[in-house]
Amino acid sequence: MTHQTHAYHMVNPSPWPLTGALSALLMTSGLIMWFHFNSTALLMLGLTTNMLTMYQWWRDIIRESTFQGHHTPVVQKGLRYGMILFIISEVLFFTGFFWAFYHSSLAPTPELGGCWPPTGINPLNPLEVPLLNTSVLLASGVSITWAHHSLMEGNRSHMLQALFITITLGVYFTLLQASEYYEAPFTISDGVYGSTFFVATGFHGLHVIIGSTFLIVCFFRQLKFHFTSNHHFGFEAAAWYWHFVDVVWLFLYVSIYWWGS
Protein backbone atom coordinates (compact mmCIF):
# COMPACT_ATOMS: atom_id res chain seq x y z
CA MET A 1 0.00 0.00 0.00
CA THR A 2 1.35 3.44 -0.92
CA HIS A 3 1.98 6.01 1.81
CA GLN A 4 -0.89 8.45 2.41
CA THR A 5 -0.95 11.64 4.47
CA HIS A 6 -4.66 11.57 5.36
CA ALA A 7 -6.97 9.44 7.50
CA TYR A 8 -9.46 8.53 4.77
CA HIS A 9 -9.91 5.02 3.38
CA MET A 10 -9.12 4.83 -0.34
CA VAL A 11 -11.21 1.79 -1.30
CA ASN A 12 -9.80 -0.75 -3.75
CA PRO A 13 -11.86 -1.74 -6.83
CA SER A 14 -14.54 -4.28 -5.86
CA PRO A 15 -16.86 -6.52 -7.91
CA TRP A 16 -19.50 -6.74 -5.17
CA PRO A 17 -21.60 -3.66 -6.06
CA LEU A 18 -22.01 -5.11 -9.56
CA THR A 19 -22.85 -8.63 -8.37
CA GLY A 20 -25.21 -7.12 -5.77
CA ALA A 21 -27.05 -5.17 -8.47
CA LEU A 22 -27.29 -8.28 -10.66
CA SER A 23 -28.61 -10.36 -7.74
CA ALA A 24 -31.25 -7.68 -7.05
CA LEU A 25 -32.30 -7.84 -10.72
CA LEU A 26 -32.51 -11.63 -10.55
CA MET A 27 -34.57 -11.51 -7.33
CA THR A 28 -37.10 -8.98 -8.64
CA SER A 29 -37.38 -10.81 -11.97
CA GLY A 30 -37.67 -14.08 -10.04
CA LEU A 31 -40.53 -12.69 -7.96
CA ILE A 32 -42.42 -11.83 -11.15
CA MET A 33 -41.78 -15.32 -12.55
CA TRP A 34 -42.96 -16.85 -9.26
CA PHE A 35 -46.15 -14.74 -9.10
CA HIS A 36 -47.17 -15.20 -12.73
CA PHE A 37 -45.70 -18.57 -13.79
CA ASN A 38 -45.23 -20.38 -10.44
CA SER A 39 -41.53 -20.89 -11.21
CA THR A 40 -39.02 -20.28 -8.40
CA ALA A 41 -35.78 -21.12 -10.27
CA LEU A 42 -34.84 -17.49 -11.04
CA LEU A 43 -35.82 -16.36 -7.53
CA MET A 44 -33.62 -19.04 -5.93
CA LEU A 45 -30.73 -18.03 -8.20
CA GLY A 46 -31.19 -14.39 -7.17
CA LEU A 47 -31.32 -15.25 -3.46
CA THR A 48 -28.21 -17.45 -3.77
CA THR A 49 -26.17 -14.78 -5.58
CA ASN A 50 -27.38 -12.18 -3.07
CA MET A 51 -26.27 -14.31 -0.10
CA LEU A 52 -22.87 -14.95 -1.72
CA THR A 53 -22.42 -11.23 -2.45
CA MET A 54 -23.32 -10.28 1.13
CA TYR A 55 -20.89 -12.85 2.56
CA GLN A 56 -17.96 -11.78 0.39
CA TRP A 57 -18.63 -8.03 0.66
CA TRP A 58 -18.90 -8.17 4.47
CA ARG A 59 -15.79 -10.39 4.56
CA ASP A 60 -13.83 -7.68 2.69
CA ILE A 61 -15.16 -4.92 4.97
CA ILE A 62 -14.19 -6.93 8.07
CA ARG A 63 -10.69 -7.45 6.65
CA GLU A 64 -10.31 -3.72 5.91
CA SER A 65 -11.69 -2.50 9.24
CA THR A 66 -10.58 -5.11 11.79
CA PHE A 67 -7.34 -6.47 10.36
CA GLN A 68 -5.96 -3.70 8.11
CA GLY A 69 -7.00 -0.73 10.26
CA HIS A 70 -8.56 1.31 7.44
CA HIS A 71 -11.56 2.39 9.53
CA THR A 72 -9.96 5.31 11.33
CA PRO A 73 -12.07 7.63 13.56
CA VAL A 74 -12.59 9.93 10.55
CA VAL A 75 -13.84 7.02 8.41
CA GLN A 76 -16.10 5.79 11.23
CA LYS A 77 -17.62 9.27 11.50
CA GLY A 78 -18.49 9.15 7.79
CA LEU A 79 -19.97 5.67 8.17
CA ARG A 80 -22.14 6.91 11.05
CA TYR A 81 -23.47 9.76 8.91
CA GLY A 82 -24.16 7.24 6.14
CA MET A 83 -26.11 4.94 8.47
CA ILE A 84 -28.13 7.87 9.82
CA LEU A 85 -29.06 8.95 6.27
CA PHE A 86 -29.95 5.34 5.40
CA ILE A 87 -32.31 5.11 8.39
CA ILE A 88 -33.87 8.47 7.41
CA SER A 89 -34.52 7.06 3.92
CA GLU A 90 -36.17 4.03 5.54
CA VAL A 91 -38.39 6.35 7.60
CA LEU A 92 -39.55 7.99 4.36
CA PHE A 93 -40.08 4.53 2.83
CA PHE A 94 -42.48 3.53 5.63
CA THR A 95 -44.11 6.99 5.61
CA GLY A 96 -45.57 6.09 2.21
CA PHE A 97 -47.28 3.00 3.65
CA PHE A 98 -48.72 4.93 6.60
CA TRP A 99 -49.89 7.63 4.17
CA ALA A 100 -51.71 5.02 2.07
CA PHE A 101 -53.31 3.52 5.19
CA TYR A 102 -54.53 6.81 6.67
CA HIS A 103 -55.62 8.14 3.27
CA SER A 104 -57.88 5.09 2.92
CA SER A 105 -59.08 4.82 6.52
CA LEU A 106 -59.74 8.41 7.61
CA ALA A 107 -62.25 9.03 4.80
CA PRO A 108 -63.49 5.62 3.55
CA THR A 109 -65.07 5.75 0.09
CA PRO A 110 -68.60 4.45 -0.65
CA GLU A 111 -66.99 1.46 -2.38
CA LEU A 112 -65.62 0.40 1.03
CA GLY A 113 -69.06 0.72 2.60
CA GLY A 114 -68.27 4.15 4.04
CA CYS A 115 -66.66 2.53 7.10
CA TRP A 116 -63.31 1.23 8.33
CA PRO A 117 -62.47 -1.62 8.40
CA PRO A 118 -64.32 -2.10 5.09
CA THR A 119 -67.51 -4.14 4.99
CA GLY A 120 -66.73 -7.87 5.06
CA ILE A 121 -63.30 -7.54 6.67
CA ASN A 122 -62.75 -9.21 10.05
CA PRO A 123 -59.65 -7.50 11.51
CA LEU A 124 -57.21 -9.28 13.80
CA ASN A 125 -57.62 -8.80 17.55
CA PRO A 126 -54.89 -6.32 18.61
CA LEU A 127 -54.79 -7.80 22.12
CA GLU A 128 -53.73 -11.29 20.99
CA VAL A 129 -50.73 -12.11 18.75
CA PRO A 130 -50.02 -8.44 17.79
CA LEU A 131 -49.68 -7.50 21.47
CA LEU A 132 -47.36 -10.48 22.06
CA ASN A 133 -45.30 -9.38 19.05
CA THR A 134 -45.08 -5.88 20.53
CA SER A 135 -43.81 -7.20 23.87
CA VAL A 136 -41.29 -9.45 22.07
CA LEU A 137 -39.83 -6.56 20.07
CA LEU A 138 -39.76 -4.23 23.09
CA ALA A 139 -37.90 -6.93 25.05
CA SER A 140 -35.43 -7.28 22.17
CA GLY A 141 -34.85 -3.52 22.32
CA VAL A 142 -33.92 -3.88 26.00
CA SER A 143 -31.57 -6.81 25.33
CA ILE A 144 -29.77 -5.07 22.43
CA THR A 145 -29.19 -2.07 24.74
CA TRP A 146 -27.84 -4.46 27.37
CA ALA A 147 -25.50 -5.91 24.73
CA HIS A 148 -24.28 -2.42 23.77
CA HIS A 149 -23.60 -1.41 27.38
CA SER A 150 -21.82 -4.72 28.04
CA LEU A 151 -19.60 -4.14 25.00
CA MET A 152 -18.76 -0.60 26.15
CA GLU A 153 -17.81 -1.99 29.58
CA GLY A 154 -15.68 -4.78 28.07
CA ASN A 155 -17.94 -7.55 29.43
CA ARG A 156 -17.71 -10.02 26.55
CA SER A 157 -19.80 -12.86 28.02
CA HIS A 158 -22.74 -10.58 28.89
CA MET A 159 -22.57 -9.02 25.43
CA LEU A 160 -22.80 -12.45 23.80
CA GLN A 161 -25.69 -13.50 26.07
CA ALA A 162 -27.65 -10.31 25.37
CA LEU A 163 -27.01 -10.55 21.62
CA PHE A 164 -28.13 -14.19 21.57
CA ILE A 165 -31.35 -13.24 23.41
CA THR A 166 -31.99 -10.43 20.90
CA ILE A 167 -31.51 -12.77 17.93
CA THR A 168 -33.79 -15.39 19.52
CA LEU A 169 -36.52 -12.78 20.09
CA GLY A 170 -36.15 -11.58 16.49
CA VAL A 171 -36.59 -15.11 15.13
CA TYR A 172 -39.55 -15.65 17.50
CA PHE A 173 -41.18 -12.44 16.22
CA THR A 174 -40.76 -13.63 12.61
CA LEU A 175 -42.36 -17.01 13.40
CA LEU A 176 -45.28 -15.32 15.20
CA GLN A 177 -45.81 -12.99 12.24
CA ALA A 178 -45.75 -15.93 9.81
CA SER A 179 -48.36 -17.81 11.88
CA GLU A 180 -50.50 -14.67 12.01
CA TYR A 181 -50.38 -14.35 8.22
CA TYR A 182 -51.27 -18.02 7.84
CA GLU A 183 -54.33 -17.70 10.10
CA ALA A 184 -55.50 -14.23 8.98
CA PRO A 185 -59.15 -14.20 7.83
CA PHE A 186 -58.31 -11.86 4.91
CA THR A 187 -55.64 -11.80 2.17
CA ILE A 188 -53.60 -9.20 0.30
CA SER A 189 -56.27 -9.34 -2.43
CA ASP A 190 -59.06 -8.12 -0.09
CA GLY A 191 -59.15 -4.52 -1.24
CA VAL A 192 -57.24 -1.60 0.19
CA TYR A 193 -57.36 -2.98 3.75
CA GLY A 194 -55.66 -6.25 2.82
CA SER A 195 -53.08 -4.59 0.58
CA THR A 196 -52.07 -1.86 3.06
CA PHE A 197 -51.99 -4.34 5.96
CA PHE A 198 -49.85 -6.97 4.27
CA VAL A 199 -47.53 -4.55 2.46
CA ALA A 200 -46.82 -2.46 5.58
CA THR A 201 -46.46 -5.37 8.02
CA GLY A 202 -44.74 -7.53 5.38
CA PHE A 203 -42.03 -4.96 4.66
CA HIS A 204 -41.56 -4.51 8.40
CA GLY A 205 -41.17 -8.29 8.75
CA LEU A 206 -38.58 -8.22 5.96
CA HIS A 207 -36.68 -5.54 7.88
CA VAL A 208 -36.79 -7.70 11.02
CA ILE A 209 -35.23 -10.57 9.02
CA ILE A 210 -32.55 -8.20 7.67
CA GLY A 211 -31.87 -6.83 11.16
CA SER A 212 -31.65 -10.37 12.57
CA THR A 213 -29.10 -11.19 9.85
CA PHE A 214 -27.03 -8.15 10.87
CA LEU A 215 -27.12 -9.26 14.52
CA ILE A 216 -26.18 -12.86 13.67
CA VAL A 217 -23.10 -11.57 11.80
CA CYS A 218 -22.24 -9.40 14.83
CA PHE A 219 -22.64 -12.43 17.12
CA PHE A 220 -20.11 -14.49 15.16
CA ARG A 221 -17.76 -11.50 14.90
CA GLN A 222 -17.89 -11.08 18.67
CA LEU A 223 -17.07 -14.78 19.08
CA LYS A 224 -13.89 -14.04 17.10
CA PHE A 225 -13.03 -10.98 19.27
CA HIS A 226 -13.59 -8.45 16.47
CA PHE A 227 -15.21 -5.76 18.66
CA THR A 228 -13.63 -3.55 21.30
CA SER A 229 -15.15 -0.85 23.49
CA ASN A 230 -13.94 1.88 21.10
CA HIS A 231 -14.03 0.05 17.75
CA HIS A 232 -17.42 -1.57 17.08
CA PHE A 233 -19.26 0.43 14.43
CA GLY A 234 -20.60 -2.74 12.78
CA PHE A 235 -22.47 -3.64 15.95
CA GLU A 236 -23.52 -0.03 16.59
CA ALA A 237 -25.08 0.26 13.11
CA ALA A 238 -26.95 -3.04 13.61
CA ALA A 239 -28.25 -1.80 16.99
CA TRP A 240 -29.46 1.50 15.48
CA TYR A 241 -31.23 -0.44 12.75
CA TRP A 242 -32.88 -2.73 15.32
CA HIS A 243 -34.15 0.23 17.35
CA PHE A 244 -35.59 1.69 14.12
CA VAL A 245 -37.41 -1.60 13.46
CA ASP A 246 -38.80 -1.45 17.03
CA VAL A 247 -40.15 2.08 16.59
CA VAL A 248 -41.75 1.29 13.21
CA TRP A 249 -43.54 -1.68 14.78
CA LEU A 250 -44.97 0.52 17.56
CA PHE A 251 -46.42 2.86 14.92
CA LEU A 252 -47.77 -0.14 12.96
CA TYR A 253 -49.36 -1.62 16.08
CA VAL A 254 -51.03 1.61 17.17
CA SER A 255 -52.15 2.59 13.65
CA ILE A 256 -53.11 -0.60 11.82
CA TYR A 257 -53.77 -3.17 14.54
CA TRP A 258 -55.29 -1.06 17.33
CA TRP A 259 -56.82 2.09 15.80
CA GLY A 260 -57.46 0.46 12.41
CA SER A 261 -59.44 -2.41 13.90
Swiss-Prot record:
Keywords: Membrane, Mitochondrion, Mitochondrion inner membrane, Translocase, Transmembrane, Transmembrane helix. InterPro entries: Cyt_c/ubiquinol_Oxase_su3 (IPR024791), Cyt_c_oxase_su3_dom (IPR033945), Cyt_c_oxidase-like_su3 (IPR000298), Cyt_c_oxidase_su3-like_sf (IPR035973), Cyt_c_oxidase_su3_a-hlx (IPR013833). Its main location: mitochondrion. Its EC number is 7.1.1.9. Pfam families: COX3. Component of the cytochrome c oxidase, the last enzyme in the mitochondrial electron transport chain which drives oxidative phosphorylation. The respiratory chain contains 3 multisubunit complexes succinate dehydrogenase (complex II, CII), ubiquinol-cytochrome c oxidoreductase (cytochrome b-c1 complex, complex III, CIII) and cytochrome c oxidase (complex IV, CIV), that cooperate to transfer electrons derived from NADH and succinate to molecular oxygen, creating an electrochemical gradient over the inner membrane that drives transmembrane transport and the ATP synthase. Belongs to the cytochrome c oxidase subunit 3 family. This is Cytochrome c oxidase subunit 3. It comes from Syncerus caffer. The lineage of its organism: Eukaryota, Metazoa, Chordata, Craniata, Vertebrata. The gene is MT-CO3.
